[in-house]
């Protein structure tokens, strides 16, 4: 199992209120070849959430948008909220492990830009709300 599912009850609603199931996920880091993870993400719909919240890092490859939308297909029929993480904007890039031993000059090397606009459109077209600012 690539992803860990934790169930937590948070007693916030007044007594007698209908229970609300919220599914939160983050850091999917999907690529088109991650078949096991795609299947696992599809299984999240069986949890029957009332609301889905994603806090980013959907992508890990420039060709991942269709993969992400396919993996989330059933969840996209449920009300959802999302923000992007840094990995939704730029591909991961190799980082020299010796950089920790060098002086930090404040510059950051970013990977190639990812098609986050396509992901944004795909999620919003299915009714999810973009909470990025």
Segments the model singles out, each with a brief description of its role:
Residues 1-16:
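N-terminal membrane-anchoring alpha-helices
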Residues 29-31, 87:
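Histidine-centered divalent metal-coordination motifs
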Residues 36-133:
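Core catalytic region of metal-dependent phosphoesterases/phosphodiesterases
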Residues 16-20, 48:
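Proline/glycine-enriched tight loop/beta-turn segments at coil->beta junctions
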Residues 11, 23, 129-131:
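General small-molecule cofactor/ligand-binding pocket signal
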Residues 19-29:
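Active-site-proximal beta-strand elements of phosphoester/diester hydrolases
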Residues 12, 31-35:
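Catalytic core of the metallo-beta-lactamase
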